[in-house]
């Protein structure tokens, strides 16, 4: 396989950050953290720019933009506005693709409109912003490169009942990001990091979650999705999770520590534990089906 992130990443002292979904939660925490760093510039985006009022209007290093990641014209306009605003100083060093929401409910009841909207925001929105950023980064004459954080989730690795299309969108982010990371020429110095947080204390389970109409066939309390809902509700009531500022601190550390960037970054002990458990089960499953899988054992095989 083509290696990724082969060199240490060095964050410029005057780095420009482009962050999506800055109205609340992780995006807001990252924007606030970047805004507090001397010398750094921030391009903070949200569908409603009035939600960015927490950022200083009088700081020339901060640009607040309206951007809808589901609209290609809106994304293109945001990048052009940033280039026009910063002029000769325009560059994008770090991108944080954070805009997204969860669609939960019984899979049989999800409408075509709901499933497409989920992918437009979580997956295609990430794609649009990433491609525009790569275009800027790979054309730098001094191989300045850049770093792209794509916010996935524990849900991009481990799938749970009642969130099929949310999982599908995050699995898509994971696979697409890894593939694109392997397409980058080492000389471009473009790094990727897929971020996989678990329970963050945001409005993700409230205003950032959309629910489908319930399906009567799945209404029973003994159904897996209903049991998970009960479990999650108890966790929220107990205050389970970590603050968005913790995510912001870690991402800034990854960007600024002058070391190799991890392709995947699970956030929380719970995420590491559940991902480890899934990988162990997958290895066991591979052993179980190894005899069935070896259909090419007597043929020429690719060397990996």
Swiss-Prot record:
GO molecular function: oxidoreductase activity
Record-listed NADP(+) binding positions: 26, 45, 68, 98, 166, 170, 200, 202
Active site per database record: 152 (proton donor), 166 (proton acceptor), 170 (lowers pka of active site tyr)
Any one Pfam family match given in the protein's UniProt record, by short name: adh_short
CDD domains per record: 17beta-HSD-like_SDR_c
Keyword hit for Cytoplasm: no
Annotated EC: 1.-.-.-
Keyword NADP: yes
Biotechnological utility: Calbistrin A has been reported to possess a number of interesting bioactivities including antifungal active against Candida albicans and cytotoxic toward both healthy and leukemic human cells.
Induction or repression: Expression is induced in complex medium (Czapek yeast autolysate medium) supporting calbistrin production.
Pathway: Secondary metabolite biosynthesis
Enzyme class, first EC level, given as a word: oxidoreductase
Alphabetic keyword roster: NADP, Oxidoreductase
Function: Oxidoreductase; part of the gene cluster that mediates the biosynthesis of calbistrin A and related compounds. Calbistrin A is a secondary metabolite with an interesting structure that was recently found to have bioactivity against leukemia cells. It consists of two polyketides linked by an ester bond: a bicyclic decalin containing polyketide and a linear 12 carbon dioic acid structure. The polyketide synthase calA is probably responsible for forming the decalin moiety.
Similarity section: Belongs to the short-chain dehydrogenases/reductases (SDR) family.
Name of this protein: Oxidoreductase calM
Lineage of producing organism: Eukaryota, Fungi, Dikarya, Ascomycota, Pezizomycotina
């Amino acid at each position: 396989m083509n290696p990724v992130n082969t060199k240490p990443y060095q964050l410029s002292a005057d780095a420009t950050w482009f962050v999506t979904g800055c109205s609340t939660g992780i995006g807001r925490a990252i924007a606030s953290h970047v805004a507090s760093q001397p010398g750094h510039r921030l391009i903070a985006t949200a569908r409603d720019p009035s939600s960015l009022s927490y950022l200083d209007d009088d700081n020339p290093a901060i640009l607040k933009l309206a951007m809808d990641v589901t609209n290609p014209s809106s994304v293109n306009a945001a990048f052009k506005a940033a280039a026009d605003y910063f002029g000769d100083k325009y560059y994008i060093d770090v991108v944080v693709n954070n805009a997204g929401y969860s669609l939960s409910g019984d899979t049989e009841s999800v409408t075509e409109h709901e499933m497409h909207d989920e992918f437009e925001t979580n997956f295609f929105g990430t794609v649009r912003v990433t491609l525009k950023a790569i275009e800027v980064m790979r054309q730098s004459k001094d191989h300045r490169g850049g770093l792209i954080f794509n916010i996935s989730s524990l849900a991009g690795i481990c799938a749970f009942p009642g969130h099929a299309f949310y999982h599908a969108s995050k699995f898509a982010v994971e696979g697409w990001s890894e593939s694109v990371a392997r397409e980058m020429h080492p000389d471009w110095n473009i790094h990727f990091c897929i971020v996989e947080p678990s329970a963050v204390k945001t409005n993700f389970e409230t205003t950032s979650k959309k629910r489908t109409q319930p399906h009567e066939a799945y209404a029973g309390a003994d159904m897996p999705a209903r049991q998970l809902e009960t479990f999650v509700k108890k966790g929220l009531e107990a205050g389970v999770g970590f603050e968005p500022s913790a995510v912001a601190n870690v991402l800034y550390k990854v960007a600024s520590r002058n070391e190799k960037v991890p392709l995947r970054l699970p956030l929380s002990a719970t995420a590491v534990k559940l991902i480890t458990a899934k990988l162990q089960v997958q290895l066991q499953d591979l052993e179980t089906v190894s005899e069935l899988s070896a259909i090419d054992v007597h043929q020429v095989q690719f060397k990996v």
